[in-house]
UniProtKB/Swiss-Prot annotation:
HAMAP family: PGAM_GpmA (MF_01039)
Record-given protein name: 2,3-bisphosphoglycerate-dependent phosphoglycerate mutase
Pfam family, one: His_Phos_1
Keyword Methyltransferase: no
Native organism taxonomy: Bacteria, Bacillati, Bacillota, Bacilli, Bacillales
Function of the molecule: Catalyzes the interconversion of 2-phosphoglycerate and 3-phosphoglycerate.
Family classification: Belongs to the phosphoglycerate mutase family. BPG-dependent PGAM subfamily.
InterPro entries: His_Pase_superF_clade-1, His_PPase_superfam, PG/BPGM_mutase_AS, Phosphogly_mut1
Residues annotated to bind substrate: 8-15, 21-22, 60, 87-90, 98, 114-115, 183-184
Encoding gene, per UniProt annotation: gpmA
Entry EC no(s): 5.4.2.11
One BP annotation, GO: gluconeogenesis
Reaction(s) the record says it catalyses: (2R)-2-phosphoglycerate = (2R)-3-phosphoglycerate
Gene3D superfamilies reported in the protein's UniProt record: Phosphoglycerate mutase-like (3.40.50.1240)
Key words, A-Z: Gluconeogenesis, Glycolysis, Isomerase
Length: 228
């Protein structure tokens, strides 16, 4: 039976400081490391054998993947990394304190940017974009595909093709797959997997460092789901 494990990265340093993160590359906090280690132990304790893992290009997800595989004694499995699993790009909000953003733009506007399905935040500056284009981790990507900012809908539109072309192919081979990613890239996958409405998915909360297991039928219909 195909099995999918979705795990949002552990708490990051910027999560702890209440900052918009997006594509900004930050490490796990001490609490985040403990969450990721705990996730690995839960997978080990439930005797789940992972065949392959997918993660983003951002350090907090990469670290979470490493801690999960170490904690479950499966460091040797193949791990594939893709920018398509990156967090939603928060554009000009990245690096800003969320409370300060509310004071500047108002509670309603910030809530709309954060929780609407198809509303984008302000674009990042050309200087910010130039820094991303020069970053070695993104050198292999067509720069025309690099976002200035994203809505949840935009995030879904880059995540689902990666699911179809890569992740789902291993599940169709009856494998157990780990996806260690981010709140919004995982939210996009959940919307697609469960067929949730736009209204339902924007309010869907995803815990940090908590493995969410999907048991799937042979044609990848959700049979059961549960947190470890």
């Amino acid at each position: 039976m195909p099995k999918l494990i979705l795990c949002r990265h552990g708490q990051s340093e910027w999560n702890a400081k209440n900052l918009f993160t997006g594509w900004a590359d930050v490490k796990l906090s001490k609490q985040g490391i403990e969450e990721a280690q705990s996730a690995g132990k839960k997978i080990y304790g439930n005797q789940i054998e992972i065949d392959i893992a997918f993660t983003s290009l951002l350090t907090r997800a990469l670290e979470t993947t490493q801690y999960i595989l170490a904690g479950s004694d499966q460091q040797w499995i193949p791990v594939y990394k893709s920018w398509r699993l990156n967090e939603r790009h928060y554009g000009g909000l990245q690096g800003l304190n969320k409370d300060d953003a509310r004071k500047k733009w108002g509670e309603d506007q910030v809530h709309q940017w954060r929780r609407s399905y198809d509303v984008r935040p302000p674009r990042e500056s050309e200087e910010q974009r130039e820094a991303y284009l020069k970053n070695r981790r993104y050198q292999h990507i067509d720069h025309r595909m690099m976002p200035y900012c994203e809505s949840l809908k935009d995030t879904l539109e880059r995540v689902v093709p990666f699911w179809t072309d890569h992740i789902s192919q291993h599940l169709l081979d009856d494998k157990t797959v780990l996806v260690s990613a981010h709140g919004n890239s995982i939210r996009a996958l959940i919307k697609y997997l469960e067929g949730l409405s736009e209204e339902d998915i924007v309010g869907y909360e995803i815990k940090t460092g908590a493995p969410l297991v999907y048991e799937l039928t042979d044609d990848l219909v959700v049979k059961d789901k549960y947190y470890l």
